[in-house]
């Protein structure tokens, strides 16, 4: 299954708030219909929705998500927490959390167009896994700095997670440590994703 490129508000109405997908919010009370399902289908639907939240928020394909679940399953710690740590340490997500891009798809585009450096080297793979003490900067040219400048100026420094620091004057971000569960930017029950 390929990456979702369709109407984003439709997904937000169905799954709830997905800050990485878009900044838009649906109108209040639009198309809120109550549906009643049997108990067994209800459990399946809840697990599917949690999985879809994760997929659409981080912009993953089905295959990528399965690969991350497989890697997290091999770890000795809680599979759900390791899964969220893997997803949060992706380069496109870190750019979004630093405030260098308005959404995760916007951050993917910055990375794909070679505007981002990690430890002084150009990285053009959005799924690049960042490690503690990685320094993320923009290229030195004016165009790259201008793209990031608007987003950094409008971002809220109070929303910056504790595992990241940002220097707004030099357009530089630093990954201090691996993310703690309470700083994940999405309200999700990761155990239901692993069970699915």
Curated annotation (Swiss-Prot):
* Keyword match Ribonucleoprotein: yes
What sequence ranges are listed for the domain S4 RNA-binding? 89-150
> Which InterPro entries would you find in this protein's record?
Ribosomal_uS4, Ribosomal_uS4_bac-type, Ribosomal_uS4_CS, Ribosomal_uS4_N, S4_RNA-bd, S4_RNA-bd_sf
Q: Where is this region: Disordered?
A: 15-43
Write out the GO biological process terms: ribosomal small subunit biogenesis; translation
**Tell me, what's a Pfam family for it?**
Ribosomal_S4
Q: Name one GO cellular component term.
A: small ribosomal subunit
Q: Which family does it belong to?
A: Belongs to the universal ribosomal protein uS4 family.
User: What PANTHER family has UniProt attached to this entry?
Assistant: 30S 40S RIBOSOMAL PROTEIN (PTHR11831), SMALL RIBOSOMAL SUBUNIT PROTEIN US4M (PTHR11831:SF4)
What name does the UniProt record give this protein? Small ribosomal subunit protein uS4c
Question: Which gene carries the instructions for this protein?
Answer: rps4
């Amino acid at each position: 299954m390929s990456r979702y490129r369709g109407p984003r508000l439709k997904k937000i109405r169905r799954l709830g708030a997905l800050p990485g997908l878009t900044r838009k919010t649906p109108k209040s009370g639009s198309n809120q219909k109550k549906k009643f399902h049997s108990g067994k289908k209800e459990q399946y639907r809840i697990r599917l929705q949690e999985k879809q939240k994760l997929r659409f928020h981080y912009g993953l394909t089905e295959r990528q998500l399965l690969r991350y679940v497989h890697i997290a399953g091999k770890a000795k710690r809680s599979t759900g927490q390791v899964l969220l740590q893997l997803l949060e340490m992706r380069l496109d997500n870190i750019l979004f959390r630093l405030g260098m891009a308005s959404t995760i798809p916007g951050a993917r585009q910055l990375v794909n167009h070679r505007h981002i450096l990690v430890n002084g080297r150009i990285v053009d793979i959005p799924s690049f896994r960042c490690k503690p003490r990685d320094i993320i900067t923009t290229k030195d040219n004016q165009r790259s700095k201008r793209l990031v400048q608007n987003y950094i100026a409008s971002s809220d420094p109070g929303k910056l997670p504790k595992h990241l620091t940002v220097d707004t004057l030099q357009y530089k971000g630093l990954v201090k440590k691996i993310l703690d569960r309470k700083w994940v930017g999405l309200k999700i029950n990761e155990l239901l994703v692993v069970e699915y």
